[in-house]
Curated annotation (Swiss-Prot):
Transmembrane segments: none
Naturally occurring in which organism (per UniProt): Nicotiana tabacum (Common tobacco)
Transit peptide per record: 1-58
A Gene Ontology molecular function term of the record: ribulose-1,5-bisphosphate carboxylase/oxygenase activator activity
Listed InterPro entries: ATPase_AAA_core, P-loop_NTPase, RCA-like, RuBisCO_activase_AAA_helical
Location of this chain's protein in the cell: Plastid, Chloroplast stroma
Superkingdom field: Eukaryota
Keywords: ATP-binding, Chloroplast, Nucleotide-binding, Plastid, Transit peptide
Recorded family membership: Belongs to the RuBisCO activase family.
Residues noted as binding ATP in the record, renumbered to the chain: 169-176
GO cellular component labels: chloroplast stroma
Listed name of the protein: Ribulose bisphosphate carboxylase/oxygenase activase 1, chloroplastic
Primary localization class, coarse: plastid
Length: 442
């Protein structure tokens, strides 16, 4: 054992020399691999044999071929700027006094994703046919929307273009759907907001959200893709519907924020930071039923261009043709249906089409049994049932249409809330059910 230990110690103490017989006269193989490495010897060396001069191994420099650089290269971000608000805010953390930063945990100083992975929660992407086969876009509607969006992307001399386009009109007239059709036609993926996001339990949160969504749209535009901010039912979230609605701080700040963005569309800042670099101008499209409920300075002509949408008979026929396009309903029958219900909104005809499937669903329920509906719909290996398209005749459509109209009349005629306050009886609806066996007036 002792002999082994001493032998090992002697071996370990032997230094490695390139000049003696231990190392030999050949050059040791390098640990580097690749064809781009070459061995550089001292000056005056004529043979590969190693001399007393030091050995240097360097890598040969190769010119980078730009043609090999692809968009899918994972290292492309090292030489190109992929900056966005998420990263910019994070860089400012610790560099700005906490007095001017949002409270911890509000999400304004946390980078959630890398910029090339980041997709806004409000981004609406359309995967449908851009040719819009079977769908009808009203010419007046499309003209107004396309001209407004285009004007906001142009630099017109000495002209102040309103940033906001307010589309308002009656309920169920297809304002939002027509906007989405135009966006698809133009190849725009809008940043979406709704009235429910314009109120919060935290003061100032909706106003901050508007700024965030606006800058997200500006970032998309900066990268070469058309975008806009689309707010549905603005009057429902920021308007006053009479004395029964409370005017909150958030209502006030939403109106003020939209006014400020309309006045300074290229200088929209987020809470807790200030970036001197201007953002892209983003056109804002808002819909609503009554803009008189909004703050008057917001809807003045310099800030908001207003468009009242009231579809004509030709528009209604065109939209309804698109609604019944897969049901093989003749064009003349569509015209009869539209003319039979002149006072109804466009979504009435969509509800009418859905009512026709009631008979098919009723047949399936009677054949399956009420007790087994849950198992068949949710726990079946075969999946939920599929139905063939029922045949839609003009007689059946008119019958269901009249039923929908009677339901509407009942709501206006009965008015149970007033009856509850005035008397103990249930009103006309109860009398109709007792006398006629139906809730509909005879």
């Amino acid at each position: 054992m002792a002999t082994s230990v001493s032998t090992i110690g002697a071996v370990n103490k032997t230094p490695l020399s390139l000049n003696n017989s231990v190392a030999g006269t050949s050059v040791p193989s390098t640990a580097f691999f690749g064809k781009t490495l070459k061995k550089v010897y001292g000056k005056g060396v004529s043979s590969p044999k190693v001399t007393n001069k030091s050995l240097r191994i360097v890598a040969e420099q190769i010119d980078v071929d730009p043609k090999k650089q692809t968009d899918s290269d994972r290292w492309k971000g090292l030489v190109q700027d992929f900056s966005d608000d998420q990263q910019d805010i994070t860089r400012g953390k610790g560099m700005v006094d906490s007095l001017f930063q949002a409270p911890t945990g509000t999400g304004t100083h946390h980078a959630v994703l890398q910029s090339y992975e980041y997709v806004s929660q409000g981004l609406r992407q359309y995967n449908l046919d851009n040719k819009l086969d079977g769908f009808y876009i009203a010419p007046a509607f499309m003209d107004k929307l396309v001209v407004h969006i285009t004007k906001n992307f142009l630099k017109l001399p000495n002209i102040k273009v309103p940033l906001i386009l307010g589309i308002w009109g009656g309920k169920g007239q297809g304002k939002s759907f027509q906007c989405e059709l135009v966006f698809r036609k133009m190849g725009i993926n809008p940043i979406m907001m709704s009235a429910g996001e314009l109120e919060s339990g935290n003061a100032g949160e909706p106003a901050k959200l508007i700024r965030q969504r606006y800058r997200e749209a500006a970032e998309i535009i900066r990268k070469g893709n058309m975008c806009c901010l689309f707010i549905n039912d603005l009057d429902a979230g920021a308007g006053r519907m009479g004395g029964t609605t409370q005017y909150t701080v958030n209502n006030q700040m939403v109106n003020a924020t939209l006014m400020n963005i309309a006045d300074n569309p290229t200088n929209v800042q987020l809470p807790g930071m200030y970036n001197k670099q201007e953002n892209a101008r983003v056109p804002i499209i808002v819909t609503g039923n009554d803009f008189s409920t909004l703050y008057a300075p917001l809807i003045r002509d310099g800030r908001m261009e207003k468009f009242y949408w009231a579809p004509t008979r030709e528009d209604r026929i065109g939209v309804c043709t698109g609604i019944f396009r897969t049901d093989n309903v003749p064009a003349e029958d569509v015209v009869k249906i539209v003319d039979n219900f002149p006072g109804q909104s466009i979504d009435f005809f969509g509800a009418l089409r859905a009512r026709v499937y009631d008979d098919e669903v009723r047949k399936w329920v009677s054949g399956t049994g009420i007790e087994k509906i849950g198992d068949k719909l949710l726990n079946s290996f075969d999946g939920p049932p599929t139905f063939e398209q029922p045949k839609m005749t003009i007689e059946k459509l008119l019958e269901y249409g009249n039923m929908l109209v009677q339901e509407q009349e009942n709501v206006k005629r009965v008015q149970l809330a007033d009856k509850y306050l005035k008397e103990a009886a249930l009103g006309d609806a109860n009398a109709d059910a007792i006398n006629n066996g139906s809730f509909f007036a005879s």
